[in-house]
Structure formats: structure tokens, C-alpha cells
Amino acid sequence: MLNYQQPDASGHFGRYGGSFVAETLIHALDELKAAYARYRDDPEFVAEFKSELAHFVGRPSPIYHAARMSRELGGAQIYLKREDLNHTGAHKINNTIGQALLARRMGKPRVIAETGAGQHGVATATICARYGMECVVYMGSEDVKRQSPNVYRMHLLGARVVPVDSGSKTLKDALNEALRDWVTNVENTFYIIGTVAGPAPYPEMVRDFQSVIGEECLRQMPEMAGRQPDAVIACVGGGSNAMGIFYPYIRHEGVRLIGVEAAGHGLDSGKHAASLSAGSPGVLHGNRTYLLQDANGQIIETHSISAGLDYPGVGPEHAYLKDIGRAEYVGITDDEALQAFHRLCRTEGIIPALESSHAVAYAMKLAPTMRSDQSLLVNLSGRGDKDIGTVADLSGAEFYDRPSSRGEKVKQ
């Protein structure tokens, strides 16, 4: 892996990736490719990006030794990369800053985005408020219900949130509507895609902006643990937090890369969102990758306790890493993620996002099978404030209420 150089000039990761879009968008994508090629190594652009990460986001995010959890589980030591401590509460802000800086240089005053868990929407709304840009966020109506705190955050930040009622009313459908908007308003609009999917150059560009996560880990782990981890673990929906931490480690062949998908009610139940574990190659949202589809190539509905993992595809670089055997992908069920959520709360005083809880859950499974002198690095991609209502409801917490807009109490 020392010579890993992906994607190629046409945006392909092996047989995955590429650009499968309406003719209307070809010019916009060519324009974006040219702008990214021009600015990615531009000293002024790089300096501004790094300054925003340091002074607006609060990077570098720390690595934390989950010592009590590690002792209770036995085996490997578990370390957490604390992306939950970033401004806005997740890794998403790393990417939105990079793309917003590009949008400004390209003269695009209007920004659109899709969101599932709401974190990418909040991050996009945040940076648009900072830069004085118009912001429209598309969100599946089911996700609007289960992520209402983030919906209100977006409103507070000045964004217009558009609920999407088509299809499964989740992330896939929000992305469809965002693409339709972009086709209609391509001249003045920049589409900030939140994950490492979509047509080229998005998978590469989002990966590059997120790779600050892994680059920091390469410096921090020797200080924290004396050496690099034996395995890096991250949840995978579209896969941006995972690629952000995986990419700098790809060349370190002694480090396992483990992506954790949403197994929902179980991989055999048909109610999950594990496209790498149970899908097949196809084309969706402008790129070729692993998809959950039927025999006729129709996308099937997905399920996950976590809105951010509830997507029938995955970034094409993950598909490539799976095929070449550099990364491995496993599934964690809703119940396992919920147990991990509670355990991290009780043992370490950290409330994780349900997305991140999938990665924590797999670390809890893997650690006891390893030696105490080995280590696992988990990307804690976001905080769980947004999921409190969902967790309380699923846990049967009768006492949990939230105030309505009229000051009344509304049972969740």
C-alpha cells in the first residue's frame, strides 16, 4: 500500500466512482474539478482552511484513552478520537469549511446540502452564517422527526430546511432532491455534499478535507499509546468520517482498517443499511459503488436506528478498499449500538452519537479478543445530544419530555 494513489484522473477508484450525471451538471462538475485542482495546494487557500480549523472548529481534536471501559472489557486499550468536541459537535464541519471556501472563490452565493442526522446540515448552515451565504438544506421528513433538535439549530443559523416526503423519506431522498435543485440553479449554486459519495470530484475532495482527522491521529497516537494502533475503527454510512481517519493510515500496513455498517435488525432481516456487507455494485447519485438493490437494480429501503447511517450506498473508495482487502467491513445491530451508547455514557461520561455508537460497539466486541498491550483507535465522529429523544424513547424512559414551542410538555 506504499504506492496507494487513488482516484485516477477520471475520478475512478478501480471500477468504482466516476461521474454519472445529467448533462446539465457536466459543466458544473468540470468547473468544480478545475477549481479544486487550482486551490487544493494554493498556499493562501490552505492557510485559510487550516486557520478556520484551528480557530473556528477548535482543532486538533484530542485523543482520549477510555481507560475504565478498557479495564472492564479486558484486552486491548480503547482510544477515542474526539470529533464530538468539534464546533457543531461532529466531524462534518471539517468538510463544509473546505467546500465553502471553494464556493466563495468560485463566486457561488447560494449553497445547498443534504442531511440525514442533521449534523452536515448544521455544519453547512453554520459556515454559511459565518460567510453570509444563502443556505438551503434538504432532509427526509422521517429524519426531520427523529432529529428535531438539529432542524431547529439549522433554522437558528438562518438556513431554510426543506422536508422531503418522497420514497423512504430519509437521506437517499434528500440527496435526490438536492441534485434536482442543483440542476435547476447550477449557475449560482454550490452543492456541498456531506459524504465521500456522489460524482467526481466529491469523493476525493471530501476525503481530502476530512483527512485532517487521520493526520492528527498519526501524530497523537505515539504520544498517547507509544505507537500507532493495531486497528482503526469507524462507522460507515456514506463513509466520510471513516475515510477521514482511514486515508492517512492506508499506507501503514500493520494497522487494520475496520468500517462498521448499520446492521439494523440484523443482516438476515432485510432491515438494515449495510451495503458493503450485503449489497452489490451499481450506480446511484452519480457514482458506481456497492448498493442495496433488488434483482432488477431498484434501490431497496434501508433501516437503521441512526439517521446518519440510513443510506443504501457507500462512498466508492470504501468499495475499492473492500475489494482489494485493505479495509474490512462489519455490521452492528440497532440493539448493539444502543448498548454501546449507554455503556460509554456510564463508564466514560461521554454521550456519543448513535452513528459513532456503532463503532464503539464493535470495539467492545473486538477488544476482549486482543492483548492488553494492543490498542484500538475509534473515531468518535459526533456527540449524542441530537439522539437523546430517540434513545429515551427506545429505552422506555417515561420521564423524558421536551418543551414544545408553546412551553408545554410534549411526550417523546
Swiss-Prot record:
Pathway: Amino-acid biosynthesis; L-tryptophan biosynthesis; L-tryptophan from chorismate: step 5/5. The modification N6-(pyridoxal phosphate)lysine is found at residue 92. It comes from the Bacteria. One of its GO terms (cellular component) is cytoplasm. Keywords: Amino-acid biosynthesis, Aromatic amino acid biosynthesis, Lyase, Pyridoxal phosphate, Tryptophan biosynthesis. Its cofactor is pyridoxal 5'-phosphate. GO terms for molecular function: tryptophan synthase activity. SUPFAM superfamilies: Tryptophan synthase beta subunit-like PLP-dependent enzymes. Gene3D superfamilies: 3.40.50.1100. Its EC number is 4.2.1.20. It catalyses: (1S,2R)-1-C-(indol-3-yl)glycerol 3-phosphate + L-serine = D-glyceraldehyde 3-phosphate + L-tryptophan + H2O. The beta subunit is responsible for the synthesis of L-tryptophan from indole and L-serine. Tetramer of two alpha and two beta chains. Belongs to the TrpB family. This is Tryptophan synthase beta chain. It comes from Methylibium petroleiphilum (strain ATCC BAA-1232 / LMG 22953 / PM1). The lineage of its organism: Bacteria, Pseudomonadati, Pseudomonadota, Betaproteobacteria, Burkholderiales. The gene is trpB.
